[in-house]
Structure formats: structure tokens, C-alpha cells
Amino acid sequence: MSRRDDLTGKGPMFGNNRSHALNATRRRFNLNLQKVSVVVNGRKVNLKVSAKTAKTLRRKNLI
């Protein structure tokens, strides 16, 4: 299961955890994925989108 936004294609970002001694270990910043249903061509389609994309869809009255 890929952690990717179905509409925008955004995926996780990578960075570092930093301890008090400033040791760096790699980590992932995952998206806040939400399941939403959108009507496309008269059919209901379930998508996994980021919270930001879902907010934009709500603002444009698409969900």
C-alpha cells in the first residue's frame, strides 16, 4: 500500500531525527492521508488524498 496522494501524486518526504548529541537517523514524514469519495462522471470513486487536498476539494464543493 503506497502512501501517495491519488490526485496530486504527493508522497512522503525524508529527513532526520536529531538526538541531543545531534546524531542523525533517517526518518519519513508521511502524508496525512484521508479516504474521500468523489463523484466522477456520475460514479462515486473512493480516493486516498492528503488532508490538504481534501480541504481544497471541500472548498470547491467537489466532495
Swiss-Prot record:
Native source organism of the sequence: Mycoplasmopsis pulmonis (strain UAB CTIP) (Mycoplasma pulmonis)
GO molecular function: structural constituent of ribosome
Recorded family membership: Belongs to the bacterial ribosomal protein bL28 family.
Name the record gives this protein: Large ribosomal subunit protein bL28
Protein's GO biological process: translation
GO cellular component terms, A-Z: ribonucleoprotein complex; ribosome
SUPFAM superfamilies per record: L28p-like (SSF143800)
Gene from which this protein is expressed: rpmB
Signal peptide span: none
Region (Disordered): 1-21
Superkingdom of origin organism: Bacteria
Entry-linked InterPro entries: Bacterial_rp_bL28, Ribosomal_bL28, Ribosomal_bL28/bL31-like_sf, Ribosomal_bL28_bact-type, Ribosomal_bL28_sf
UniProt keyword list: Ribonucleoprotein, Ribosomal protein
